[in-house]
Amino acid sequence: MSGNQYTEEVMEGVNWLKKHAENEAFSFVFKCDNVQLNGKDVRWNNYTKPIQNEELTSLIRGAQTAMDQTEEEEMDWESEVDSLAKKQVQTFDALIKKCLFEVFVSKNIEPNECVWFIQHEWGKDQGWHCHVLLHSKNLQQATGKWLRRQMNMYWSRWLVTLCSVNLTPTEKIKLREIAEDSEWVTILTYRHKQTKKDYVKMVHFGNMIAYYFLTKKKIVHMTKESGYFLSTDSGWKFNFMKYQDRQIVSTLYTEQMKPETVETTVTTAQETKRGRIQTKKEVSIKCTLRDLVSKRVTSPEDWMMLQPDSYIEMMAQPGGENLLKNTLEICTLTLARTKTAFELILEKADNTKLTNFDLANSRTCQIFRMHGWNWIKVCHAIACVLNRQGGKRNTVLFHGPASTGKSIIAQAIAQAVGNVGCYNAANVNFPFNDCTNKNLIWIEEAGNFGQQVNQFKAICSGQTIRIDQKGKGSKQIEPTPVIMTTNENITIVRIGCEERPEHTQPIRDRMLNIKLVCKLPGDFGLVDKEEWPLICAWLVKHGYESTMANYTHHWGKVPEWDENWAEPKIQEGINSPGCKDLETQAASNPQSQDQVLTPLTPDVVDLALEPWSTPDTPIAETANQQSNQLGVTHKDVQASPTWSEIEADLRAIFTSEQLEEDFRDDLD
């Protein structure tokens, strides 16, 4: 049917229910049991004592009008339902509304801010009872039990006031105690599986009315069937609505609120078992943990800076300090098991800066260039170790004199990783207490291993071992790359006053040996925190993957203790940045200037005036041929001019007579 075939009253009822369909409401039930006090029977319909209260009288009159208007001719209401029961229902309706109003006053809530629905029913077993749905934005789920106690108190007080049975003061007090102790006002609750406690259960206001209350029949024979007497609500939609219209409202609401598509899922027998209900605290901790892992939080200080709200929330809970510690431990464990140190560094790279990034001029590579090394090869080897691809050689060792750049490189790598554990030499019994669940172990200023040499060898080779922790049991250290700096020769192990040479070669087999001997100038500065992420991104972009297979493909073999980092040399073109630096250094060197002014011998004049050899062979091609033989690719070297092009440029500027005259002057 189309909407215009229904009455305006029906459509208003449907729209009102749809408006409050998803509003969460409390579900109360009022009842009045039959009791006996000192031989006096007090039945459910003995609460009609007249009282001089205009507000209560007005409410009773309104309920009477609603009941009279909704009576249908085919139902002989007057003959089947006695007038005493009818009058009692009207009185109860007024009392329940009075209780609601008194609760609103106690909570400083305006009545027009609340939505409520009341329906009086008769059950074969329960007898008379009344359902009350209450919704308000100012009422939270936690206040449900308090509301029940308040309504129970007001309900028992009004029942004693309107009881028509002649009771003594003591019996009135007893009646009120029975009403409160027996909970003549109840609220819908559910029992938690784990805590075994009852918690208030909220219902959807509109759905509950349409699917449950409006589908019930109107009571005709109190002794033969169950049904409803009267319904009232805050919107005045169902106070005067007939039974047939109520059925239409329920049907229309059900059709309009039906989902467009019905999703079907197939569950196994195991999945049919109801899972454990998670508490709000568990859900909050899981959400916090996901945020910490996504933001790579590995220390309490990082947590305070990046997630202060969740930190304060957990700290304020009972046992908050232990909760913080355990949550942070789960976060670091997740990072240590799912990410490598190289991956943590790589994800911090700013791709917008990678385009203009010059690897040769980075501070780390400047230190390597001072030693005449192939800086790409050194960075590639370090990246393989950080990615747990170094095999048994799981440790990067920076050693040499002071002020050569060992610590600033190690510090930059550790800061880029984030989840780093430090070796504590001062803690003799538990030196590796901070090294569990980490992506990198940093050993600063390592000395003689002594009694701990076997533990060092196991950790430096990437083995899984168990270590003792202070105040705890033993804990497992998974394969973790190590970065170590020292001024001493750590391959010499002394236990007491005795040297143990049998440990020298095993220690060397576990180290990526990088010996720095060139002292840095005082204004060299620190390595920028963005440098190593860009170095790793540069290596990946140019095909230097952090695997040992890729390393051997480029450099011919795996690194050794006495690895020659200067070979193969990087061949730079004339226009490359490296050559410009060399030219600048040569111009500022007095010795190189004296060599330029050295007189030329006569055979040099003839050599300069003759055509140069291999006129069609580019310099860059010759360099590339040499580099390809060594397994090195130079993608950043700019194209250099050929010898013939250089000769043509020189001869265009200087004639042969001018060149000969200049050379003669120098010889004289």
UniProtKB/Swiss-Prot annotation:
**What's its EC?**
3.1.21.-, 3.6.4.12
GO cellular component labels: host cell nucleus
- Motif RCR-3: residue span? 212-216
Comment on bound cofactor: The endonuclease active site can probably bind other divalent cations.
* GO annotation (BP), single: symbiont-mediated perturbation of host cell cycle G1/S transition checkpoint
* Entry GO MF terms: ATP binding; ATP hydrolysis activity; DNA binding; endonuclease activity; helicase activity; metal ion binding
Annotated region described as Ori-binding, given as residue ranges = 193-197
Cofactor(s) required, per the database record: Mg(2+)
The subcellular location is:
Host nucleus
- Identify the keywords attached in UniProt to this record, alphabetized: ATP-binding, Covalent protein-DNA linkage, DNA replication, DNA-binding, Endonuclease, G1/S host cell cycle checkpoint dysregulation by virus, Helicase, Host G2/M cell cycle arrest by virus, Host nucleus, Host-virus interaction, Hydrolase, Magnesium, Metal-binding, Modulation of host cell apoptosis by virus, Modulation of host cell cycle by virus, Nuclease, Nucleotide-binding, Transcription, Transcription regulation, Viral DNA replication, Viral genome packaging, Viral release from host cell
Q: Where is the active site?
A: Y212
Comment, domains: In the N-terminus, the endonuclease region is involved in binding to the origin of replication. In the middle, there are the ATPase and helicase activities. The C-terminus probably contains a transactivation domain.
Q: What does this protein do?
A: Multifunctional protein which displays endonuclease and helicase activities required for initiating and directing viral DNA replication. Also plays a role in viral packaging and transactivation of several promoters. Binds site-specifically to 2-3 approximate tandem copies within the origins of replication (Ori), unwinds this hairpin region and nicks one DNA strand thereby initiating the rolling circle replication (RCR). Cooperatively binds Ori with host PIF and probably other host factors, which activate the nickase function of NS1.
For this entry, the protein name equals Initiator protein NS1
Origin organism is Canine parvovirus type 2 (isolate Dog/United States/CPV-N/1978) (CPV-2)
For this protein's source organism, the top of the classification is: Viruses, Monodnaviria, Shotokuvirae, Cossaviricota, Quintoviricetes
